Design a protein with these regions (language model features):
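Substrate-binding pocket helix/loop in short-chain dehydrogenase/reductase
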Residues: 96-109, 204
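Active-site helix of classical SDR
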Residues: 120, 157, 165
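Residue(s) in the substrate-gating loop at a strand-loop-helix junction
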Residues: 141
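Alpha-helical segment proximal to the catalytic Tyr-Lys
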Residues: 125, 169-174, 232
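C-terminal helical subdomain
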Residues: 180, 199-230, 234, 241-243
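Short C-terminal tail/terminal secondary-structure segment
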Residues: 2, 146, 224, 235-257
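Conserved glycine-rich cofactor-binding loop
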Residues: 18-20
């Protein structure tokens, strides 16, 4: 039977929850009256709130092990528990692997893989004290599942995140469920930087079976499901939220002129 979860007494920690996909996830949990805590390097210009529910902000460099440990301890001390963790912080510009320095490549891997492991580690140390019901969701990308020129380090990191998810799900069961979401092309405030003009974005949308780019809300809905009682037997999986992926190139090539 479908269950309508009550998030009013749940504490949700979201990394990178001030913009893009992360902001959509933050707003979704706030709309359900969850206590939302954002971990990010830069404080938003104004407090994020929905229906009078306000997100709390903790400044944190998720690539800094000592800083993460300190902040998670502060969050736990103030809130007594952490029920849900969304590892969303990440991203990378497109650049050919040989045009980037190894310092750059390593920084991308740190942000998109190692930081999620670090935050999960310190949060799980707190979560494991509960008998059950805690959830960690890692935000991955379709780049993890197929070659993407210009995203070697990013794709490797996101692929590693999917594997990390599966391993931690086994290690930390049954008290903590761990899943990942493989996101497709998502339209955010920075889309023009990645995809070019609005005309280019429409062209990209036409390659998707659902004929549109995704929204942060599409990813947020998947997060809500994975942290709900309706997914209580789902762990160690990667849910693909990408509108059907991309239409195979041969379909367009084979179309009669």
């Amino acid at each position: 039977m479908f269950k309508t979860d009550n998030y009013k007494n749940k504490t949700v920690v979201i990394t990178g929850g001030t913009k893009g996909i992360g902001l959509g996830i933050t707003k979704a949990y706030l709309s359900l009256s969850a206590k939302v805590i954002i971990l990010a390097r830069n404080k938003p210009k104004k407090q994020i709130q929905v229906k009078g529910n306000k997100a709390l902000f903790y400044q944190c460099n998720v690539r800094d092990n000592a800083n993460v440990e300190e902040v998670i301890n502060e969050v736990f001390k103030a809130n007594k528990c952490i029920d849900v963790l969304i590892n969303n912080a990440g991203g990378a510009p497109l650049i050919n692997s040989l045009d980037a320095s190894m310092n750059f490549n390593n920084a991308i891997i740190d942000l998109n893989l190692n930081s999620s492991f670090t935050v999960s580690y310190y949060v799980a140390k707190k979560m494991i004290k509960k008998s059950s019901g805690c959830v960690i969701t890692n935000i991955s990308s379709v780049t993890a599942t197929r070659p993407t020129p210009g995203s070697a380090a990013y794709g490797a990191a996101k692929g590693g995140l999917v594997n990390l998810t599966k391993t931690l799900a086994v290690e930390w069961a049954p008290r903590i469920r761990v899943n990942s979401i493989i996101t497709g092309y998502i339209e955010t405030e920075n889309s023009l930087i990645h995809y070019g003009s609005k005309k280019d974005m429409k062209a990209v949308a036409k390659t998707i079976p659902m004929q549109r780019m995704g929204t942060p809300e599409d990813i947020a809905n998947a997060c809500i499901f994975l942290s709900s009682a309706n997914s209580s037997w789902i762990t160690g999986t990667a849910i693909e939220v990408h509108g059907g992926g991309e239409s195979p190139a041969y379909l367009n090539s084979a179309k009669p002129k």
